[in-house]
């Protein structure tokens, strides 16, 4: 079996048989279960005679989820080859209002942050959702409305901090001229963040001042390998450049091989290795 993706419009709409709609409501992805099945799937269905593929998506989204108000975005066209090749269009829906589930083949609607384990099409649906995640990413600078997801992710990166400590620290950054953060938003969900600062004291390996500094960077596990960290870093670098910086510093824990590989892959050079000591007195 092979799944391929194309730009919207590359495939003749007359050849399309399916519309698949990756939908979010209340900060969670929506999955549906048909009455005759015990597995979950992304909403979608067959194109009916006389419908455009966008009309198919709108109808299927309502019939399978009860969505009443939503914004529908075309993501891409796709094909699935398994003996024969079938074509469809992938959509993203940001649902603002849901009503009762209409009478249809759907028995249950599930809202959660990630794919269920029991999938109707396990070889196809993870690829479709991944494509949506790659396509609808948006990098935003933090404001007060982002504090809750920022704190939640910050505690995963720095688990030794309490909620109150993290909340206080991040609120201070909101009002700082020397430090800020950027979040990656995927629809209604937040998938990662970078916290950057301007340092005027010596930064290991630098030969300029001031220097931009990565105070922390984190991507939720299920959103890794989607290019999010690189996009966050690029946005942080532009912020530092606008403030007169020509270099960017960072540091990692010595055992963190994945973080080391990321830093070297995006152009950082190792400047030094430092071992820190502490003792109780």
Which sequence ranges carry the predicted segments?
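Conserved beta-strand in the GNAT
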Residues: 183, 189-198, 213, 218
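Conserved acetyl-CoA-binding loop-helix of GNAT-fold acetyltransferases
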Residues: 53-59, 219, 225-238, 265
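Acidic, metal-coordinating catalytic segment for phosphate/diphosphate chemistry
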Residues: 1-20
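A short beta-loop-alpha structural element at the N-terminal edge
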Residues: 137-150
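Conserved Nudix-box catalytic region and its N-terminal flanking loop in Nudix hydrolases
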Residues: 24-63
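Conserved GNAT acetyl-CoA-binding A-motif
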Residues: 240-252
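Unchanged
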Residues: 48-71, 77-131
């Amino acid at each position: 079996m092979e799944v391929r993706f194309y730009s919207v419009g590359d495939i003749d709409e007359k050849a399309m048989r399916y519309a698949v709609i990756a939908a979010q409501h209340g900060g969670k992805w929506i999955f549906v279960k048909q009455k005759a099945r015990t597995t979950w799937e992304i909403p979608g269905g067959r194109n009916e005679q006389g419908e455009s593929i966008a009309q198919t998506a709108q109808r299927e989204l309502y019939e399978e989820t009860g969505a009443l108000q939503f914004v529908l975005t075309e993501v891409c066209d796709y094909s699935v080859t398994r003996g024969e090749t079938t074509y469809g269009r992938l959509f993203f829906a940001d649902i603002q209002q849901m009503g009762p589930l209409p009478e249809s083949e759907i028995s249950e609607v599930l809202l959660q942050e990630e794919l269920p384990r029991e999938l109707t099409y396990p070889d196809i649906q993870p690829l479709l959702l991944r494509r949506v995640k790659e396509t609808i990413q948006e990098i935003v600078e933090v404001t007060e409305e982002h504090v809750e997801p920022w704190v939640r992710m910050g505690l995963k990166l720095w688990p030794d901090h309490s909620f109150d400590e993290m909340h206080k620290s991040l609120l201070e950054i909101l009002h700082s001229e020397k430090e800020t953060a950027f979040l990656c938003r995927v629809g209604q969900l937040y998938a990662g963040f970078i916290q950057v600062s301007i340092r005027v004291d010596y930064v290991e390996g630098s030969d300029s001042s001031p220097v931009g500094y990565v105070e922390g960077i984190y991507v939720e596990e299920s959103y890794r390998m989607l290019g999010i960290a690189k996009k966050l870093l690029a946005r942080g670098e532009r912020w530092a450049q606008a403030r007169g910086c020509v270099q960017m510093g960072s540091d990692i824990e010595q055992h963190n091989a994945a973080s080391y590989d990321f830093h070297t892959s995006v152009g950082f050079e190792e400047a030094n290795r430092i071992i820190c000591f502490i003792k109780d007195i």
